Design a protein with these regions (language model features):
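DNA-dependent DNA polymerase catalytic subunits
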Residues: 2-33, 38-255
Length: 255
């Protein structure tokens, strides 16, 4: 198969490049199918590798990003990196998605702000404590149903009229059908709904009560949103909210 052959060639090139880096005393921190993370190489060393790859394999290597620091999780391919301008990269970010409830999105950006200011390993350790405390406090507020309903809302645009959904009915359409009891709902409308403990599992924000909120469902969404960041910091969501900790060690590399 072509895909397998292409993957094999890519893997071979990466492995050979790793060996070449070692031969000119560049420390390779991590490599996958299409990238390498190198610890503090000089411009001259980078150019040597670029020239070598072009001559040896006809491959153009580019310096993609320069990180102030990067943290690799014990989980395969999970990492967190902060570029020199303070921009935070975390593989598989979900906190930026437009339908993410405001309270989770707010926490997400607060965490990125903390990480972007880290300038040393000691500050990184302090940031872990801050991040852990923040998530723990948000979780407590969620369990106590102290977060305003509008902050819990999933905001989704409907692509067609609710009546056009027959077989599979998404959650935002279930909420839209409830809203139809009070007003007309049409294609293009934004439906704001919250997750509740009783059927049908969701309610429009304007029809919901705080005591109906399914805090467990929101906790699951919090965990899935922050899993990549936390695993890269050797923090465990379950531990932060009071459950047993999973073991793991992070690897910190400063440039």
């Amino acid at each position: 198969p072509v895909a397998e052959a292409t993957t094999a060639v890519g893997r071979f090139t990466i492995l050979e490049t790793i060996e070449k880096c070692k031969s000119i005393e560049i420390e390779v921190l991590y490599g996958d199918t299409d990238s390498l993370f190198l610890k503090g190489p000089t411009r001259e060393q980078i150019q040597k590798i670029v020239d070598w790859a072009k001559e040896e394999f006809g491959v153009d290597l580019d310096l993609d990003k320069e990180y102030r620091y990067v943290v690799f999780s014990t989980r395969k391919k999970n990492y967190l990196g902060v570029q020199k301008d303070g921009k935070v990269d975390v593989k598989g970010l979900t906190g930026k998605k437009s339908h993410t409830p405001p309270f989770i999105r707010k926490l997400f950006y607060e965490i990125l702000e903390i990480l972007s200011k880290v300038q040393s390993e000691n500050e990184f350790s302090q940031s872990k404590q801050k991040v852990g405390d923040m998530i723990s406090q948000y979780a407590k507020n969620l369990k106590a149903r102290q977060i305003p309903l509008n902050e819990l809302a999933f905001n989704v645009m409907i692509s067609k009229a609710p009546s056009e959904y027959v077989k599979t009915i998404p959650q935002h359409i279930r909420a839209a059908k409830l809203l139809e009891q009070t007003r007309e709902i049409k294609k293009g409308d934004i439906i704001s709904y919250v997750k509740i403990i009783n059927k049908p599992g969701v309610k429009p924000v304007e029809m919901a009560r705080p005591d109906e909120i399914d805090s467990a469902k929101y906790m699951e969404f919090m965990e899935s949103t922050f899993d990549q960041i936390l695993s890269s910091m050797d923090l465990d969501f379950s531990t932060l909210i009071g459950a047993p900790k999973q073991t793991g060690l992070d690897q910190f590399f400063w440039n």
